[in-house]
Curated annotation (Swiss-Prot):
Keyword presence, Cytoplasm: no
Assembly: Component of very early pre-60S ribosomal particles containing 27SA2 pre-rRNA. Interacts with URB1. Together with DBP6, NOP8, URB1 and RSA3, forms an RNA-independent complex, which is required during early maturation of nascent 60S ribosomal subunits.
Top-level taxon of the source organism: Eukaryota
Compartments in which it is found: Nucleus, Nucleolus
Keywords: Nucleus, Ribosome biogenesis, rRNA processing
Job description of the protein: Required for 27S pre-rRNA processing. Has an early role during 60S ribosomal subunit assembly.
GO biological process, one term: ribosome biogenesis
Pfam family, one: Urb2
Protein name according to UniProt: Nucleolar pre-ribosomal-associated protein 2
Main location: nucleus
Keyword Transmembrane helix: no
Organism of origin: Saccharomyces cerevisiae (strain ATCC 204508 / S288c)
Length: 1174
C-alpha cells in the first residue's frame, strides 16, 4: 500500500490545503492520508469530498499520471468518497468528466501482477461503484481490449476461484455477454485482442482444463466469437497463425486445435484437416498430439487425409515422427491399415530389430483393423503373399510367439465357413508346394486359435479338412511333424490308422538326423502318437536324449520344461531315473519354468518326476529358489526321510533371518517327523530356532511388525509335541523342555534364548498341567527384567525388556496367569521409566507401545486415562486390540463408564487437531463397534458424535486419512449395526457426505480424490440399500444429493476418473431399482411386489429433477466421454422407470437445446439401454 516513511504535514488553512492537494507532486498515498484525516480537520473546507473526487478524476484522465491508476490508494479513496457524498446529482456530474472506458482499459493494463497475487483489486470495486451512477457503454473493440488485459492477469491470480472471479468482473463491466450476434468484423477484433492471451492462459494454467472454470469461460468465448457458421474462421485462423507464429508455443497450438475439435461438429472434418495442416506446418512435433486428440474426442478426418499423412510419414526421414504418428493414424481409420498393409509390413520388418515394441504395436493394429472389418481371412491371404514373397527374413511375423499371439486372440471372429475356406485354401497351397513353409506356419496359427476358443461345432466342421494333413502326398517339409502334433493336441481321435502304422518307419529311418532343424517337433509328434498306440519308445528316447545333451543351457531348460509339462505321464512311466534326473537338472536352471510347472497339481501325480524334483531341490537347499519351490510341493509328496534331512540341513547353522528358510521349515513341520534334531533335542531347538532378543528387535524395527506376530518355528515344534503329549517321544521332549526352562528361570542371569522359550511355553500351559508354576516364574522373571531396565537404562537390555512386556500382555489376555500381586510394582516401574524418558526428552516409541499394552490391563475403571494415553503413542494394530479388550472388560461391569467415554469422545470432535485426528477416529470406531443393541444411550451418543464431526471438522484440521477411516466405518456400521442410525442421523449423514466430498475434491491429489469420492458414494449407497424405508417421504433429499454429486463430477471432470462415475451410476441405479423392502407386517406373497411398485411410483414423480440436472450439465459443462459412458447405466435406469407421461412433462419443461439433447439421449437409451427379449 506504500506506507509513509514520515508523517505528512497538513496545512492548517483551506488555501494551502487545496494547493497541496492540487500539486502534481502530491502522490496518491499522500492524498489518501489527507482524506483519512478530513474528520479531524479544524480548517473550514466546504465540499472537500467533491473537491478531492474532482481532483482524482482529473488525475485519472491525465495520460501522464499512470501512477494514480495503479495505486490502491486512488481507488480506495475514490470508492470512499462516492459513499461519503450524499448528492447523486453532483456525483453524476463529476463522473461524466471521467474518461471511464479508456481509464478502465488502461487500469486493467497497468495493474501490477504482484497485487493480483494478494487478491488486491480495489479498482474493480470502484468501477462497479461508477456503474451504479452511470451507464458505461463499451464498443465491441473496447470490451475486447479490456478483456485482453484481464486475461493477461489471470495466470497471476493465486487460485482458480479468484481467477474466475476476476475474469467474471471484467465480463460484467464490459457486458460482453450481451453481444448476441457475431460477424467477421467482431471475429477479427476477437482474434486481434483476446485469442492470443486466451491461448497463453490455456498453456500456463496448472489445473486440469476441464475443472478450470476460467478455462471453460475463455473456450466458450472462442466458440462464440470465432467458430460460428457465418464467420470465415478458416481465413481468420490462417491469418492469426501467420501473424503470431513466433509467439504461439506448442501448448498454445495444442489448446487452439483442441478448441476447434470441441466446437466443430463431425461434419466439419474438412476444416479440421485444414487447421491440422496449418498448425502442423508450424509445429510438426504436435501432429501426434493432434491425432490423439481426434481419437479421444471421437472426431475424425477423411480417409484420404489420413492416407496422405501416413504416406508422408512412411517417406519421412524423421524416424521419431514415423514411430509416434503411425499408430494413431491406424487407430483413427481401420481402412488405412487394411489398404496399406504391405507398406506397413515392410515398416514392421525394417523396425523389428531397432524397436520391437513399435513393430509389435503396428502389427496388433493391423490385425485389429482386419478383425473389426470382418476381414481376418483376407489378412491371412495378404500375410501369406507377403511372407512367401519376402522369404525367411519375414517369417518372424508368423513364427514369433508374440506375433502369433496377436493373431490367435482375434481368430474367434471367424465364422465356421471362414474357418473351412481358410484351412482348405492353406492345405491346397501345401499340397501344391510342400516346400513353402508359410502356409504351414499359418495352419499352425489356426490350430492354436482352434485350441484356445473355437466352439465344438466349428471344431467338428473343420475336422475333415484338417485330417487331410495326414494324407497329403509329397509332404516333405519337416514342419509337418509340428503340424501333426498340433492337430493331435486339438483332436483326440483324428489320427488315421495309416499314420499309426508309419511310426515304425519313422523310428527306424534316419529322419531324426536329416531334420535337425525341427527335430524337436518330430519328437513331440512321436510322444503324442505314443498316447494313441503302444510301441517301443526306446530308440526315440535315446535319440531325444542325444539331441538334448548337445543343446546349450537355455534351450535345454526350455525343452525339458516342454517335455515334462506336455508329456508328464509318458516321461514318468517310460524314461529312466537317470534320464528324468537329467531333465529335472536342466529344468531347474530356469526358475520361471519351474514355477509354471509347479502350478499344475497334476505333476505331483507322477511319482518318478516328483521324486527326482524333490531330491534335486533338497540338495539345493542353500538356494532361495529351491526353498520357494519346496513350499509349493504338497507335504504328502515329500518323503519323511527327505524332510528329516532337510530340516537338519536348514538348521545346521545358527538361526538365519532368511524368510524363505523359515517358511520352508514351517511347511516341512506341518507334518512333523519327530526325528529331526530340533524335534528331539530341546537345547538344539532353542539354539537354532529362537532369535536372540537383539536379532528379534532389529527385525521388527525394519519390518514394523513384532516377532511374536510371526509364525514361530519353536512354537510349531512345541505344539506338534503337545498334540501327542502322551506318546513316549513327545512326553520325553516336553519334560526335558519344562525342566530346562525352570532351571534357567531360577537363575538370576539365565540364558536369554531359554528365557524366551520359557515365555513361549507359559502361553500353552493348561490349568491342569503339573508344570503350571512355569507361568508364575515367567511373570516374575519378566517383572525382574522390567525392573532391571528401569534401573540401568542400558541399550542392551531393551530387546529383552520389550519381549518381556509382550509376554506379560499375552499371558494375561489369554487368561493364563495372574498379575495382581505384581500390579503396584509394575506401575512404579513404568512411572520411573516414563519420568526418565521425559527428563531426557528421548522418544522410545516401541517401548512405549509395549508399556501401553501392559498398562491398559492394570488401570481398571480408568478408560479416559487409557484412551488419552493411546492418543500420545505411535499407533499399531496391537494398541487397537488393547483398547478393545479394555472396553470389553469395562462393559462386563455395565455401560456407564463406556457411555461416559463415548460422550467425551463425541464432544472432542470440536477440538480435534490433525496430528492426533487419525488416532482419535480410531478410538471412536473401536468404541462404536462395541455399542450394544440394548444400549439406548450409546445409540444417542453415537448420533451426537457424528453430528459433532459434521459440524466442526474440515479437511485441514481433520485430515484426509481420518475422513477415509470414519466413512469406511460408517459404511460398515450401516450394514452390521443398522439400529445405530435413527431417522435424524440418516438425514444428517447426507449433507455430511456432501460436505466431505467438497473438502476432498478441493484439497487432495487426484488419487486421493477418487478414492475418497468412491468411498463416500458407497456410504450413500449403503444408506439407500439398508435404510430406504427412511426415505419414503424424503425423495427430495436424495434428489438434491444426486444433483449436487453430478455437479461435482461436472466441475471436476478432469480429476475424477471413470471409476468414480461408475460408483455414481450404481447409486442412481439402486435408487431407481428398490429391492430391499421390509415386509414384516404382512406375509402375503404379492405384498413385497406391491411395495416395490409403490416405491417406484413415488420415485418416478421425483427423479425427473436428477435427469434434468444431468441434461443441463451435459449441455453447459460437457462431461468427458469416459465419464459420460460410465454414467450411462444410471441414466438408463432412470428411463426404465419413467412412463410416457413423465417423459412428456420433462420435454415440455426443457428449452430448445435441452429438448434436442433429451431426444438424442432417449434414442440412445432405446438403442442400447432398454431391455429387449432378443
Amino acid at each position: 500500500m506504500g506506507d509513509l516513511t514520515e508523517e505528512l504535514s497538513i496545512p492548517d488553512n483551506a488555501q494551502d490545503l487545496s494547493k497541496l492537494l492540487r500539486s502534481t507532486s502530491t502522490k496518491p498515498h499522500q492524498i489518501a492520508e489527507i482524506v483519512s484525516k478530513f474528520d479531524k480537520l479544524e480548517t473550514y473546507f466546504p465540499k472537500k469530498e467533491i473537491f478531492v473526487l474532482d481532483l482524482l478524476i482529473d488525475r485519472l484522465n491525465n495520460g501522464n499520471l499512470d501512477d494514480f491508476k495503479t495505486s490502491e490508494h486512488t481507488w480506495i479513496i475514490f470508492t470512499r468518497l462516492l459513499d461519503a457524498i450524499n448528492d447523486p446529482i453532483s456525483i453524476k456530474k463529476l463522473l461524466k468528466k471521467l474518461k471511464t472506458v479508456p481509464v478502465m482499459i488502461r487500469t486493467f493494463f497497468l495493474w501490477p501482477k504482484d497485487k493480483l497475487l494478494t487478491r488486491s483489486v480495489s479498482f474493480i470495486k470502484a468501477f462497479f461503484a461508477i456503474n451504479d451512477y452511470l451507464i458505461v457503454n463499451f464498443s465491441v473493440e473496447e470490451s475486447f481490449q479490456l478483456l485482453e488485459h484481464a486475461i493477461n492477469g489471470l495466470s497471476s491470480c493465486p487460485t482458480t476461484d479468484f481467477a474466475l472471479s476476476y475474469l467474471q468482473d471484467a465480463c460484467n463491466l464490459t457486458h460482453v455477454d450481451n453481444i448476441t450476434t457475431t460477424d467477421n468484423k467482431i471475429a477479427t477484433c476477437y482474434c486481434k485482442h483476446m485469442l492470443l492471451p486466451s491461448l497463453r492462459y490455456f498453456a500456463q494454467t496448472k489445473n486440469s482444463a476441464s475443472s478450470n472454470q476460467s478455462f471453460i469461460r475463455l473456450s466458450h468465448f472462442m466458440g462464440k466469437f470465432l467458430l460460428q457458421p457465418r464467420i470465415d474462421y478458416m481465413k481468420l485462423n490462417k491469418k492469426f497463425v501467420q501473424e503470431n507464429a513466433s509467439e504461439i508455443t506448442d501448448d498454445m497450438a495444442y489448446y487452439y486445435f483442441a478448441t476447434f475439435v470441441t466446437f466443430l461438429s463431425k461434419d466439419n472434418f474438412a476444416q479440421l484437416e485444414v487447421i491440422f495442416t496449418i498448425l502442423g506446418a508450424k509445429k510438426p512435433s504436435l501432429e501426434c498430439r493432434f491425432l490423439n486428440l481426434l481419437s479421444e474426442s471421437k472426431k475424425t478426418v477423411s480417409q484420404e487425409f489420413l492416407e496422405a499423412l501416413l504416406l508422408e510419414m512412411l517417406a519421412s526421414t524423421d524416424e521419431s515422427g514415423v514411430l509416434s504418428l503411425i499408430p494413431i493414424i491406424l487407430k483413427l481409420d481401420i481402412e488405412v491399415a487394411i489398404k496399406h498393409i504391405f507398406r506397413l509390413l515392410e515398416l514392421i520388418q525394417l523396425e523389428n530389430l531397432n524397436d520391437p515394441l513399435f513393430s509389435s504395436h503396428i502389427w496388433d493394429l493391423i490385425i485389429q483393423s482386419h478383425a473389426n472389418a470382418r476381414e481376418l481371412s483376407d489378412f491371412f491371404a495378404k500375410i501369406n503373399e507377403y511372407c512367401s514373397r519376402k522369404g525367411p527374413d519375414s517369417y518372424f511375423l508368423i513364427n514369433h510367439p508374440a506375433y502369433v499371439k496377436s493373431i490367435t486372440k482375434q481368430l474367434f471372429t471367424l465364422s465356421s465357413l471362414q474357418w473351412k475356406n481358410l484351412l482348405q485354401a492353406l492345405l491346397d497351397q501345401v499340397n501344391h508346394d510342400s516346400t513353402n513353409r508359410v502356409p504351414l506356419y499359418l495352419i499352425r496359427i489356426c490350430l492354436e486359435g482352434l485350441s484356445e476358443g473355437a466352439s465344438r461345432a466349428t471344431l467338428d466342421e473343420v475336422k475333415p479338412i484338417l485330417s487331410q494333413v495326414f494324407t497329403l502326398e509329397s509332404f516333405n517339409n519337416s514342419l509337418q511333424w509340428d503340424l501333426k502334433y498340433h492337430i493331435m493336441e486339438v483332436y483326440d481321435d483324428i489320427v488315421p490308422a495309416e499314420e499309426l502304422e508309419k511310426i515304425d518307419y519313422v523310428l527306424s529311418s534316419n529322419i531324426f538326423d536329416t531334420t535337425s532343424a525341427d527335430v524337436e517337433e518330430l519328437f513331440f509328434y512321436c510322444f503324442k502318437l505314443r498316447e494313441y498306440i503302444s510301441f517301443d519308445l526306446s530308440d526315440a528316447k535315446k535319440k531325444f536324449m542325444r539331441h538334448f545333451e548337445i543343446l546349450d543351457e537355455e534351450r535345454k531348460s526350455n525343452l525339458s520344461y516342454s517335455v515334462v509339462s506336455k508329456f508328464a505321464t509318458l516321461v514318468n512311466n517310460n524314461f529312466t531315473r537317470e534320464q528324468i534326473s537329467s531333465l529335472i537338472d536342466s529344468l531347474l536352471l530356469n526358475s520361471t519354468n519351474l514355477s509354471s510347472l509347479l502350478k499344475n497339481d497334476d505333476i505331483f501325480e507322477e511319482t518318478n518326476i516328483t521324486y527326482a524334483l524333490i531330491n534335486k531341490l533338497a540338495s539345493s537347499y542353500h538356494q532361495t529358489f529351491a526353498l520357494e519351490a519346496l513350499i509349493q510341493i504338497p507335504i504328502q509328496c515329500i518323503n519323511k526321510n527327505v524332510r528329516v534331512a532337510l530340516i537338519n540341513n536348514l538348521t545346521c547353522e545358527s538361526f538365519c533371518l532368511d524368510s524363505a528358510t523359515r517358511e520352508c521349515l514351517l511347511h516341512l513341520l506341518s507334518s512333523p517327523t519327530f526325528k529331526s534334531n530340533i524335534e528331539t533335542n530341546f537345547y538344539e531347538l532353542c539354539e537354532k530356532t529362537i532369535m536372540s532378543p537383539e536379532m528379534a528387535i532389529s527385525e521388527t524395527g525394519d519390518e514394523k511388525k513384532e516377532i511374536e506376530d510371526k509364525i514361530s518355528i519353536f512354537e510349531k515344534v512345541w505344539t506338534n509335541h503337545l498334540s501327542q503329549a502322551k506318546e513316549p517321544v513327545s512326553e520325553k521332549f516336553l519334560e526335558s523342555g519344562y525342566d530346562i526352562v525352570k532351571q534357567s528361570m531360577s537363575l538370576s542371569n539365565g540364558d536369554s534364548k531359554l528365557i524366551i522359550a520359557g515365555f513361549t511355553i507359559a502361553k500353552f500351559l493348561k490349568p491342569d498341567n503339573k508344570h503350571r508354576d512355569i507361568q508364575g516364574m515367567a511373570i516374575s522373571y519378566a517383572v525382574k527384567i522390567l525392573e532391571n531396565y528401569s534401573e540401568n537404562f542400558e541399550s542392551e537390555t531393551i530387546p529383552l525388556f520389550r519381549i518381556s512386556m509382550s509376554t506379560l500382555y499375552k499371558i494375561i489376555t489369554t487368561g493364563q496367569g495372574d498379575i495382581s500381586k505384581h500390579k503396584s510394582r509394575i506401575l512404579d516401574i513404568f512411572s520411573k521409566i516414563m519420568l526418565r524418558y521425559h527428563s531426557k526428552k528421548v522418544y522410545h516409541a516401541p517401548e512405549e507401545q509395549e508399556m501401553f499394552l501392559v498398562h491398559s490391563l492394570l488401570t481398571e475403571n480408568k478408560l479416559e486415562y487409557i484412551f488419552a494415553e493411546y492418543l500420545n503413542i505411535e499407533h499399531t494394530d496391537k494398541c487397537d486390540s488393547a483398547l478393545g479388550f479394555c472396553l470389553e472388560e469395562s462393559l462386563k461391569q455395565g455401560p456407564d463408564a463406556f457411555n461416559r467415554l463415548l460422550w467425551n469422545s463425541a464432544k472432542s470432535f470440536s477440538t480435534i487437531s490433525q496430528p492426533c485426528a487419525e488416532k482419535f477416529v480410531r478410538v471412536f470406531i473401536i468404541m462404536s463397534k462395541r455399542i450394544a443393541r440394548d444400549n439406548n444411550l450409546g445409540h444417542h451418543l453415537f448420533v451426537i458424535a457424528l453430528l459433532e464431526a459434521y459440524t466442526y471438522c474440515d479437511i485441514e484440521k481433520f485430515g484426509y486419512k481420518s475422513y477415509l477411516l470414519l466413512f469406511n466405518a460408517i459404511k460398515e456400521f450401516l450394514v452390521s449395526k443398522p439400529w445405530l442410525f435413527s431417522q435424524y442421523c440418516i438425514e444428517m449423514l447426507l449433507p455430511f457426505c456432501l460436505k466431505t466430498l467438497a473438502f476432498i475434491v478441493n484439497h487432495e491429489s487426484t488419487d486421493e480424490i477418487n478414492e475418497g469420492f468412491i468411498n463416500i458414494i458407497e456410504v450413500i449407497d449403503h444408506m439407500l440399500l439398508v435404510h430406504r424405508f427412511k426415505f419414503s417421504n424424503r425423495h427430495h433429499l436424495f434428489n438434491s444429493v444426486l444433483c449436487q454429486i453430478l455437479e461435482i463430477i461436472a466441475i471436476h471432470d478432469g480429476t475424477l476418473c471413470a471409476n468414480s462415475a461408475d460408483a455414481v451410476a450404481r447409486l442412481i441405479t439402486n435408487y431407481c431399482e428398490p429391492y430391499n423392502v421390509s415386509n414384516a407386517q404382512n406375509g402375503q406373497k404379492n405384498n413385497l411386489s406391491s411395495k416395490i411398485s409403490l416405491i417406484k411410483q413415488s420415485i418416478r414423480k421425483n427423479v425427473l429433477v436428477v435427469l434434468t440436472k444431468y441434461i443441463q450439465l451435459s449441455i453447459t459443462t460437457q462431461f468427458s466421454l469416459n465419464i459420460k459412458k460410465s454414467l450411462q447405466p444410471g441414466i438408463h435406469a432412470i428411463f426404465d422407470i419413467l412412463s410416457q407421461n413423465e417423459l412428456n412433462q420433462l420435454n415440455a419443461f426443457l428449452d430448445t437445446p435441452g429438448k434436442q439433447y433429451f431426444k438424442a439421449l432417449y434414442l440412445q437409451y432405446k438403442k442400447v439401454g432398454k431391455w429387449r427379449e432378443d
